[in-house]
């Protein structure tokens, strides 16, 4: 059954436009609370709510609290905290569920609601459908004796900081390193600099003055120019950029070179292989560069691809029992450290890996150079049989590129467009292949 409200990462949209309105979020909290009460019959459920720094977070948090307590669910509120911190505390405090109010890397004018089940894992499709079935029903507030309570908890930041530090090797530290840490004026502004400082690094903080409106604005993992300039200005060893909710990571070296999620995953995997740690393999996505796949296999590390989206990477990791995965966008999963993507913990794993390899980022990543890619968006008509029209040319191009390139065709889920991506060892091979396939699709 198709979901009506939940997308791939919870409920998200523009603030003030359905579904990110206080009245809908009230119903969402009430519906989720009803499901929790039905599932947790032994005692009154407790939910943890965290948020990023968007001005709309106050409004949406109040609506959620009202919905949950009306359904008979207790609520604890942390204030601003990264998404992976909410997941961790949901597990560590043995709570019934966790909720993060954030729209991740989007502008302040957007917001969203993301749920975690008991144990800090993302909700299953079945539970999301169960919640959706109750959203449109009538709200019947519990009798006063069964209403939930809400309270703010102190020390959530400190507990998450200690957890992050515990993922770094106990026999080592970060003394001697100068780091610029860009927290995107987002959820990590209060915790990320402290983690690296307490492990011994000299920390320069930027993107750490949120005002409700400047989250992700020319800063953070989706805009690294500010970090690159700061690293050069302060003559730092590395720059670390998180996104608005703290689950993505980009890094910059002392020369201002940017390293995306693929490069950082390779560094972690190579170090684990060098240490003889069995990670099983690495899960990327259909968009992961083929050159990285080849480089990993040269290190003796297996590789497979999932659909685009960190939830699909996580599914593959769980199914295969592998430990490392992620995307070029900076979502990195280290399953032996945390059960969700965590920008701070991922940065610590990269820094630990560089110590293990006794090399800097540029040297390790020189093992492979991304294959050139050509991407073409082809507009199509509704109902156009583009797969049939392009299948012969697609087969020809794939045969020509066998072992030295690949093709990815993806229909957009939001607009009438087919995205053609061809990557190959040589740029002209990629360009020619993409143009041939795009022409065969036809478009409008």
Curated annotation (Swiss-Prot):
One of its GO terms (molecular function) is magnesium ion binding. Mg(2+) binds at residues 104, 243, 245, 247. GO terms for biological process: carbohydrate metabolic process; peptidoglycan biosynthetic process; UDP-N-acetylglucosamine biosynthetic process. It holds the Pfam family PGM_PMM_III. The modification Phosphoserine is found at residue 104. It catalyses: alpha-D-glucosamine 1-phosphate = D-glucosamine 6-phosphate. GO terms for cellular component: cytosol. Its EC number is 5.4.2.10. Catalyzes the conversion of glucosamine-6-phosphate to glucosamine-1-phosphate. Belongs to the phosphohexose mutase family. This is Phosphoglucosamine mutase. It comes from Neisseria meningitidis serogroup B (strain ATCC BAA-335 / MC58).
């Amino acid at each position: 059954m198709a979901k009506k409200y939940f997308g791939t990462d919870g409920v998200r949209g523009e603030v003030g436009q359905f579904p990110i309105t206080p009245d809908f979020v009230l119903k969402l909290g009430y519906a989720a609370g009803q499901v929790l009460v039905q599932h947790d019959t032994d005692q009154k459920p407790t939910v943890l709510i965290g948020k990023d720094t968007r001005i709309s977070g106050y409004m949406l948090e109040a609506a959620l609290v009202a919905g949950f307590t009306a359904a008979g669910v207790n609520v604890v509120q942390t204030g601003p905290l990264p998404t992976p911190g909410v997941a961790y505390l949901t597990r560590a405090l043995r709570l019934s569920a966790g909720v993060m109010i954030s729209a991740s890397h989007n502008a302040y004018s957007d917001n969203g609601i993301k749920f975690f089940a008991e144990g800090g894992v993302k909700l299953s499709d079945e539970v999301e459908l169960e919640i959706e079935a109750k959203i449109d029903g009538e709200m019947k507030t519990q009798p006063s004796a069964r209403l939930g309570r809400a309270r703010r908890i102190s020390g959530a930041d400190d507990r998450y900081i200690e957890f992050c530090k515990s993922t770094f090797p106990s026999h080592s530290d970060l003394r001697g390193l100068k780091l610029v840490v860009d927290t995107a004026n987002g959820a990590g502004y209060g915790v990320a600099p402290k983690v690296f400082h307490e492990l011994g690094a000299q920390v320069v903080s930027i993107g750490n003055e949120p005002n409700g409106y400047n989250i992700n604005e020319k800063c953070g993992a989706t805009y690294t120019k500010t970090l690159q300039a700061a690293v050069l200005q302060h003559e730092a060893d590395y720059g670390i950029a998180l996104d608005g909710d703290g689950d993505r990571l980009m890094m910059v070296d002392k020369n201002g070179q940017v390293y995306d999620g693929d490069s950082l995953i390779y560094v972690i995997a190579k170090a684990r292989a060098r240490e003889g740690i069995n990670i099983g393999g690495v899960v990327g996505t259909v968009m992961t560069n083929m050159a990285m796949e080849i480089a990993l296999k040269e290190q003796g590390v297996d590789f497979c691809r999932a659909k685009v989206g960190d939830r699909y990477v996580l599914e593959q990791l769980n199914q295969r029992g592998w430990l490392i995965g992620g995307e070029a966008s900076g979502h990195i999963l280290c399953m032996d450290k945390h059960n969700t993507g965590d920008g701070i913990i991922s940065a610590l794993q990269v820094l630990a890996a560089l110590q293990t390899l006794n090399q800097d980022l540029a040297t390790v990543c020189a093992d492979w150079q991304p294959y050139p890619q050509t991407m073409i968006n082809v507009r199509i008509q509704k109902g156009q049989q583009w797969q049939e029209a392009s299948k012969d040319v697609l087969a020809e191009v794939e045969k020509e590129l066998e072992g030295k390139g690949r093709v990815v065709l993806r229909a957009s889920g939001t607009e009438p467009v087919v995205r053609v991506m061809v990557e190959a060892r040589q740029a002209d091979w990629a360009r020619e292949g993409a143009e041939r396939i795009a022409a065969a699709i036809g478009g409008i």
